[in-house]
Amino acid sequence: MDNEIIVRSMHTVEKEKACVAGMPVKDTIKVSDELGYSANTPDRKSLWQIQTPQCFEYDLLAQSYDKLFSDMSYGKSVPAITDDAMIVEYGSDTKVKLIEGSYENIKVTTPEDMGDCRTFFKETQKNVKKLEISVDIL
């Protein structure tokens, strides 16, 4: 994650109360039925893969968590939560603003994601070494 994404997120949350970085999906996404068949294909234009940072006004996030935990303690059915943005969507009427992140901003969710991370960091290190060498020659 680069500083520019963090700064844009901080500025956005000042205006919007809630924002997450992400990128439009590149892949076709299928929704499956309970038997594993394709039920439909949503329009890719409306789908984003969400990354970090996820930024919220503190009180908004705290109140959203309170509602979630309260509902759970009373045995209410709640969705399977995958990130803080989902908690804000569940626990408030506030819309979460999507801002552009970077396809290089890798979100580590599964063990397989660690391989992507390692590859990215190896490539980054190669570029840093090249830069250091060119600076040393000057």
Go through each PLM region and give its residues.
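A generic structural signal for alpha->beta connector loops
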Residues: 15, 35, 93-95
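Short, flexible, basic/aromatic active-site loop/helix in glycosyltransferases
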Residues: 31-56
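Short hydrophobic/aromatic segments of transmembrane alpha-helices and their interfaces
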Residues: 11, 44-45, 96-98
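Short secondary-structure transition/capping segments
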Residues: 4, 32-34, 108-113
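Conserved beta-loop-beta/alpha segment of the NTase-like Rossmann-fold superfamily
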Residues: 1-32, 51
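Fold-independent oxyanion-binding glycine-rich loops
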Residues: 1, 23-25, 44, 52, ...
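Conserved alpha/beta core of the MobA/IspD/sugar-nucleotide pyrophosphorylase nucleotidyltransferase superfamily
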Residues: 49-138
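Short secondary-structure boundary/capping segments
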Residues: 10-11, 38-40, 88
